[in-house]
Amino acid sequence: MRRGHHEAQVLFERLGSQLGHRTRRTWTRQHPTDGVWLLDTPHLGLDEVPLAALEVVVTETGKALRGSITTLEMVSPALGILLIQDREIRRGLIRSGTSPQTATEHLRRLVAAATADISRSRQRLALWTFDQLERRTQLTLNRAA
């Protein structure tokens, strides 16, 4: 697991806990996610319901992107979050010799492709960047302090 992947998981878990949700790193073995917030519903005869699920994209391939979207659709949370770990992807591209300008353009195309793929889903999916996750976590933690 890449560092950026783990960073996103930790922040998502922290945000969910701060919002009062029970959290797990993954949904099930058959449908592994990178994080999930759970809604306990024993009064409905259900053990737990996935309130939000996270899939972190740390590679720049369209195949990986579509695989993450499919995982979110199969889990079927109230909100599926596809997180583009832009910092990790950018670091990897630049480390492999890509210029910063080309890396920025590559990320722009990846976000555009993710937006298009999400728009075709029948699930409620949101596209976040790592910066957006980090900011939401900071705002929630500051509000609680």
Model-derived features: positions:
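Catalytic cores of nucleic-acid endonucleases
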Residues: 49-115
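Acidic-basic catalytic patches of nuclease active cores, encompassing PD-(D/E)XK
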Residues: 1-34, 38-45
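Residue-level signal for beta-strand positions within conserved beta-sheet cores that form or flank
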Residues: 31, 50, 123
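Residues at the C-termini of beta-strands that transition into short coil/loop
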Residues: 27, 57, 131
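Long, low-complexity, intrinsically disordered polar/charged segments
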Residues: 1-6, 43-44, 50-51, 110-117, ...
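Charged, structured surface patches that assemble and position nucleic-acid processing machinery
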Residues: 102-141, 145
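Residue-level detector of flexible, active-site-proximal loop/helix-junction positions
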Residues: 42, 60, 132-134
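Hydrophobic, Leu/Ile/Phe/Ala-enriched alpha-helical segments that form helix-helix packing faces
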Residues: 8, 12-23, 97, 107, ...
